[in-house]
Amino acid sequence: MRRITLLTNPDKCNLNCPLCFLNQRGFSRCVLGVGEMAFETARTAIEKYAAERNASGKRVLREVIPSTMGEPLLYSHFEDLLSLCRSMELPLNLTTNGTFPGKWGCEAGMELLLRSCSDIKVSCLASEQFDGWKANVEKLLDVRQKLMADAAQGGDAANSMLNARALGIATVSLQVTLHKKNVDKAAELVSWASSVGINRIKWNPVVLLSTASQQLREMYALDDAQIESLRQELRNGALSASNVKHEGSLFFNNGKVFCAVGGKCESCPFADEVWVWPDGHEDHCPDPERRWSKVHT
């Protein structure tokens, strides 16, 4: 497997975002009830896939992703996970809600994350719940700029920014859930991202589960014209910045259904990835409707 995602703490979060798949299910936020992943479960999964080699003897596993449901920095064993991956020279691909709780909000904590991760994605889904996320991103980027300058041995950190990974320092991305309330702010977001040094924006049109309420749909659902308009503006450069990459499900061939490839597993861009649940069982399909709409209801 190229990447593994550990669902370390899907029920543990410090925010309550309305578009979270657990909230869309129409039940209380913590009904998933699967608990936290024991560290030994995480270790076993990582060591299992880290042992895989390709025909030339090179390790196949490139990175580990801690929970993308819940806030991974609240995982009780996050520091242990970080230490294990560092010892195995496996970078983490981190997605956080931007609150940077506890030690992770201080300069030393951010420096450790930047040295240990391949990419740090800050989800803009939390923007309605937490208005301090931009300030935290700017602080993270300030810490990275200092690291880049040191790594470049006094060279021009700005010119080295695009080579962050080559210097062993994480890139910083935004993960944007596009919906009715924020689609008209895309240009403003791109401008800010470019000015502060964001490397990439992942644009993902909102996915509403079949269990989502009508009220939620009326508040957040996008129509096809809005999605297509933004897609074209980003593709033709009208809404782009030369120093920011644009990726995400907005650019998938078929973004109108839950599965972006229409259920054709042989075309799935995630075919060489696996998701490990807290109890250790494995899941190979990322379709949110299948995964979240009926689990433990």
Language model features: what each stretch is:
Residues 1-111, 115-119, 155, 219-225:
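Conserved alpha-helical substructure of the radical SAM core
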Residues 23, 28-33, 37-40, 83, ...:
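Radical SAM enzyme [4Fe-4S]-AdoMet core and its adjacent flexible, acidic
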